[in-house]
Amino acid sequence: MKNILKVFNTTILALIIIIATFSNSANAADSGTLNYEVYKYNTNDTSIANDYFNKPAKYIKKNGKLYVQITVNHSHWITGMSIEGHKENIISKNTAKDERTSEFEVSKLNGKIDGKIDVYIDEKVNGKPFKYDHHYNITYKFNGPTDVAGANAPGKDDKNSASGSDKGSDGTTTGQSESNSSNKDKVENPQTNAGTPAYIYTIPVASLALLIAITLFVRKKSKGNVE
């Protein structure tokens, strides 16, 4: 009887270790960091807004969908953001650093993705009064992994992009020249593969079946010893 209990306990411990190992491996494969740049819309030219985005970003896969978590500085200047039509989901703020981290659903982690940014400034900049109110399209260039697939599609982005080189109230140009072009949500090779790997569900089911079988075996042996 003692030997049977030892085998039973060892088996349970082994199952726990196996499940934990596979779960950790799956989670590790579906999250990480990615470098990126912010371009002027539909170009390869770096946007002036690029300086307001901290690098790298973080990506995570949840329920078969891909998300990126992006941190911006000068947070109070950036009044709104969206990527592929998906509005930001603010997950953290740091008032002291004037930063916030927002999460966006995306279709891929590598390549160009369209976005939109709203900027409002009404304060002194470099010692001079400055007022700037602008909404414009931008393009993100993600340099993340190509082997992490998502099942999501782009949302409906706002088609009304703002004009290019604007001026503040003091007549100083912002140095930003964004394209005045409608956003057609051109997504390169959208990923449509399923989400969570099948083995994540198979392992617990198989483990439960094995546990039941071992339990029944132990009970049967115990009855045999008593009789």
UniProtKB/Swiss-Prot annotation:
Cite the record's Low complexity compositional bias ranges. Answer: 161-175
The record places the motif (NPQTN sorting signal) at 189-193
| GO cellular component terms attached to this protein's record | extracellular region; peptidoglycan-based cell wall
Per the entry, what induces it?
A: Repressed by fur in the presence of iron.
Residues where Pentaglycyl murein peptidoglycan amidated threonine is found: T192
Its family? Belongs to the IsdC family.
Transmembrane domains' residue ranges: none
Name-wise, this protein is Iron-regulated surface determinant protein C
The record, for SUPFAM superfamilies, names: NEAT domain-like
Positions of the region Disordered? Answer: 149-194
Subcellular location, in the record's words? Secreted, Cell wall
Query: What's the gene?
Result: isdC
Among InterPro entries, the record links this protein to: Haem_uptake_protein_IsdC, IsdA, NEAT_dom, NEAT_dom_sf, Sortase_SrtB_sig_NPQTN
One GO-annotated biological process of the protein: heme transport
Instruction: Specify the signal sequence span.
Output: 1-28
Topology of the protein relative to the lipid bilayer? Peptidoglycan-anchor
Q: Which SMART domains does the protein's record reference?
A: NEAT
Indicate the quaternary assembly: Monomer. Interacts with IsdA.
